[in-house]
């Protein structure tokens, strides 16, 4: 509904309490001449919530809002009019000389009346209202709240400085049709900032804001956007504006039930900001809506559908209503390899000339259109190919000169500090190219699900699948359909791909099997990057094929040529479509040769690894076989045979020295770990299977030595000092002190006459005594046996004592022999012979030899060498004890004979 002004003259709008006589107008005009009066300037600041009027004539020649901007020369221009910087396109006001003296940022109230029965009290008008004939009989100004005409903009809902104005019935008696369209904008409006900020600093007008109606740089833009503007913090709130997309500068409010008239337009139609006011809130900032000179008809305008989501969940694309905004043609449906490159492409490819003034914040989001528009899109692409290249360069430089960009999904606006960086990024941006016609790119597929049969089972529901390419060891796949419609249906399917909602679908960059010989790739290479200009997704089949060793990938060399017409989700792009037959460019041929060389190298490496793997397996099997053979031989050897060999051993070898015995004991466990070390120090195989097998072979090879180390040692640790003991050694403390230097002594015993009478001769007592020293460890006993034979220049005779029973039997034999010798001197030699032929040592040898295998069997020892040596040691100990007992018996016999002779001499 168009609202017009009833009369160019002023009407009474002031509240009743502000009414004054017309004579006061001349007095007020005199006060206005003195604009440097401090009192009036203070009055101007305290009335920041009031509205401003330029003049009574201008109040009806333009919309009811502060629509004129001023320069230093005092000229004013209308925001509807396109102008060049430094010129004013508006009318000269009657108080032009006063405006030149006043601050251009804060033009004070002009015209007679200044709140005294005239329009002066409503001089500063809000941007949301239009020229309406507001007469005193229909508007009660005194009843209007401060929230309706508050300051330099309407109070926002989020940070309101006054009560919010209602959507309907704001002005009694005024139709609300013209205000229906923006009653829902209260949530996105912002309160004004303090007016004196940035006072007196004139800035240039933002060209984007003037020509296109909005500025994507938002609060980060250093240019001037006027006193009123709307800053949008998030993308979702843009749906409230319903930005037009097809017609340049066509600002419509789709929520309004009636068409907005042309004179309603203006770059700051709904802007609540104060002069140079800025909010520091990050995010996508739109300084104004795309409102141009006048509103064209909305017949061909595609509006945003609030019932349709901004993004399709299945494809990651925008809805069809928003997708037509994307006119720069940057390829964003495929995940880029370089985010910075993508950012530069998004910023740089936004063409800022008259052809792209309809591009808004939605311009960088790719959408999927209906199938009905696919032919129109294809024709538009072919027609746009005639755009001169130098014009594209000019537009790119113009866009990169600003050096700022904003992302839709981000909460903070990105600022590029240097224009050189932006220019460099623009040089590296990829050129727009067409998409594949029938091939879909499947990404984020789990490795276990990335199989040909599973992918085919899902996509064959939508149509005939003619090719599936799965790169090796990747989460990607390329599925090509026989028809374009089938691929689109699979792309727009609402259900999850293969039952996994994380799997995403995009259009691929090219078709593996070209269609009608059309090439969709430009084939141009970029400097500084080893990728084609067709986009980041071009590298996916190339990089994946370099890892593949399948023969089928050789047939996919035509992947480098793409075919087909532009997809329905593509926007018109200035590209050159080559309709000639498929060509193999030198770059593509070079890549194919490189791919073949890589595959050949990979095949040779795999053959070498397989050969090494087989060799390691053979070695491992041989070593395991050798270990099992040795164990079987040890287990099959009978115990009786070992006893027989031990008993038949030579007595000379049995009386081996303790040094050699100890050395052999120490050498045996050393040899075994050396043999096992050979198994454990093998060169590790690169195969993961061999790494798993190595710990097993290592533990099995060290199994026997580990058990032997903890084997129970039953060898004796008792040493006997054969009598006669030297004088002074027949004391337990002395014996212990002498032998404790070689190791820890657990027990010292003096045999025979341990408790003697003081009346007997000490020398005779020492001759009949023997000392038994028991050590804690066998090693200490061996050391003492080898080195403790000398005590104060006396030589000691040391023997091993195997058992307590053996010592007792020897003592009994010695006592019986001494008694028999005392009775008959002549039969002493026979007694000695009988002692030497005593069968007990032989029995003891057998028992010891049989006991040792039992002990080894209990401990689980399978080492025959250790068993043999232990058996020999026990035999040597027994033989030594036998010889010692024989020698002791002969000495006892000799001493008994001498004692008997002495007693006979005494009797005589």
Swiss-Prot record:
Phosphoserine PTM positions: 657
Feature: compositional bias, Polar residues: 1-13, 48-59, 90-105, 356-373, 559-588, 677-688, 846-863
Coiled coil listed as a keyword: yes
PROSITE patterns: RRM (PS50102), ZF_C3H1 (PS50103)
Gene3D superfamilies found in the cross-reference section: 3.30.70.330
Region (Disordered): 1-124, 333-375, 558-590, 629-695, 807-908
Basic and acidic residues biased stretches: 630-647, 865-886
Keywords: Coiled coil, DNA-binding, Metal-binding, Phosphoprotein, RNA-binding, Zinc, Zinc-finger
Domain RRM: 438-510
Protein name (record): Zinc finger CCCH domain-containing protein 41
Species: Arabidopsis thaliana
């Amino acid at each position: 509904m168009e609202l017009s002004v009833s009369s160019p003259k002023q009407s009474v709008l002031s509240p009743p309490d502000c009414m004054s006589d017309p004579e006061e107008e001349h007095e007020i005009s005199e006060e206005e001449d003195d604009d440097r009066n401090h009192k009036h300037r203070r009055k101007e600041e305290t009335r920041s919530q009031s509205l401003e009027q330029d003049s009574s004539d201008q109040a009806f020649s333009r919309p009811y809002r502060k629509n004129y901007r001023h320069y230093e020369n005092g000229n004013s221009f209308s925001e509807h009019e396109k102008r060049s910087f430094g010129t004013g396109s508006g009318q000269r006001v009657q108080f032009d000389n006063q405006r030149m003296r006043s601050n251009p940022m804060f033009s004070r109230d002009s015209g007679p009346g200044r709140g005294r029965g005239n329009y002066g009290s409503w001089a500063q008008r809000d941007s949301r209202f239009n020229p309406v004939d507001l007469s005193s009989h229909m508007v009660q100004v005194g009843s209007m709240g401060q929230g309706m005409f508050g300051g330099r903009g309407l109070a926002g809902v989020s940070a309101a400085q006054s009560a919010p104005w209602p959507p309907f019935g704001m002005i009694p008696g005024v139709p609300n049709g013209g205000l229906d369209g923006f009653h829902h904008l209260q949530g996105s409006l912002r309160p004004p900032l303090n007016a004196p900020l940035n006072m007196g600093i004139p800035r240039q007008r933002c060209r984007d804001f003037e020509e296109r109606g909005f500025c994507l740089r938002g609060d980060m833009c250093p240019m001037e956007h006027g006193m009123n503007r709307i800053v949008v913090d998030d993308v979702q709130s843009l749906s409230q504006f319903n930005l037009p997309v097809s017609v340049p500068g066509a600002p419509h409010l789709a929520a309004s039930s009636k068409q907005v008239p042309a004179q309603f337009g203006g770059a700051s139609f709904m802007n609540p900001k104060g002069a140079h006011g800025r909010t520091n809130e990050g995010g996508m900032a739109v300084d104004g809506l795309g409102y141009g000179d006048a509103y064209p008809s909305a017949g061909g305008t595609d509006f945003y559908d609030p019932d349709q989501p901004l993004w399709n969940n299945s494809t990651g694309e925008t809805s069809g209503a928003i997708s037509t905004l994307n006119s720069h043609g940057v390829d964003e449906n495929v995940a880029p390899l370089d985010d910075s490159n993508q950012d530069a492409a998004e910023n740089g490819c936004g063409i800022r000339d008259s052809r792209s003034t309809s591009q808004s914040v939605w311009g960088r989001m790719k959408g999927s259109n209906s199938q009905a528009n696919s032919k129109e899109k294809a024709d538009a692409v072919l027609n746009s190919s005639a755009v001169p290249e130098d014009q594209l360069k000019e537009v790119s430089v113009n866009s990169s000169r600003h050096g700022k960009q904003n992302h839709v999904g981000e909460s903070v606006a990105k600022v590029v500090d240097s224009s050189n960086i932006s220019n460099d990024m623009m040089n590296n941006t990829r050129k727009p190219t067409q998409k594949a016609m029938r091939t879909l790119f499947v990404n984020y597929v789990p490795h276990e699900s990335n199989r040909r049969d599973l992918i085919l089972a899902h996509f064959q529901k939508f149509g005939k699948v003619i090719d599936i390419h799965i790169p090796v060891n990747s989460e990607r796949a390329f599925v090509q359909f026989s028809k374009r419609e089938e691929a689109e249906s699979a792309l727009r399917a609402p259900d999850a791909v293969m039952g996994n909602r994380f799997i995403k679908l995009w259009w691929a960059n090219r078709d593996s099997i070209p269609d009608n010989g059309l090439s969709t790739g430009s084939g141009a290479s970029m400097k500084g990057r080893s990728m084609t200009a067709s986009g980041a997704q071009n590298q996916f089949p190339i990089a994946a094929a370099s890892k593949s060793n399948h023969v089928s990938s050789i047939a996919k060399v035509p992947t480098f040529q793409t075919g087909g017409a532009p997809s329905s989700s593509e926007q018109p792009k200035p590209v050159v479509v080559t309709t000639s037959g498929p060509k193999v460019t030198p770059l593509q041929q070079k890549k194919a040769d490189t791919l073949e060389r890589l595959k050949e190298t990979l095949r040779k490496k795999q053959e070498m690894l397989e050969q090494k793997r087989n060799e390691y397996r053979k070695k491992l099997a041989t070593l395991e076989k050798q270990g099992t053979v040795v164990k079987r031989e040890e287990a099959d050897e009978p115990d009786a045979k070992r006893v027989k060999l031990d008993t038949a051993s030579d007595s000379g070898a049995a009386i081996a020295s303790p040094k050699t015995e100890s050395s052999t004991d120490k050498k045996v466990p050393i040899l075994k770990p050396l043999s096992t070390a050979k198994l454990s120090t093998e060169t590790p195989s690169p195969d993961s299977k061999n790494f798993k097998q190595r710990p097993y072979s290592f533990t099995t090879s060290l199994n026997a030595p580990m058990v032997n180390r903890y084997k129970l040692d039953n060898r004796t640790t008792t040493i006997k000092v054969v009598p006669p003991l030297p004088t002074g050694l027949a004391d337990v403390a002395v014996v212990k002190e002498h032998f404790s230097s070689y190791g820890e002594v657990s027990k010292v015993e003096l045999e025979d006459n341990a408790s003697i009478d003081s009346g007997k001769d000490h020398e005779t007592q020492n001759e009949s005594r023997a000392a038994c020293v028991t050590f804690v460890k066998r090693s200490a006993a061996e050391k003492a046996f080898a080195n403790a034979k000398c005590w104060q220049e006396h030589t000691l005779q040391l023997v091993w004592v195997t058992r307590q029973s053996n010592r007792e039997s020897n003592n009994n034999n010695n006592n019986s022999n001494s008694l028999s010798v005392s009775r008959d001197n002549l039969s002493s030699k026979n007694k000695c012979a009988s002692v030497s032929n005593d069968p007990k040592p032989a029995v003891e040898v057998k028992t010891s030899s049989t006991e040792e295998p039992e002990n080894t069997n209990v401990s689980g020892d399978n080492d025959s060498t250790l068993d043999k040596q232990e058996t020999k040691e026990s035999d040597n100990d027994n033989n030594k004890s036998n010889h010692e007992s024989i020698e002791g018996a002969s000495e006892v016999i000799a001493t008994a004979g001498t004692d008997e002779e002495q007693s006979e001499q005494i009797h005589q």
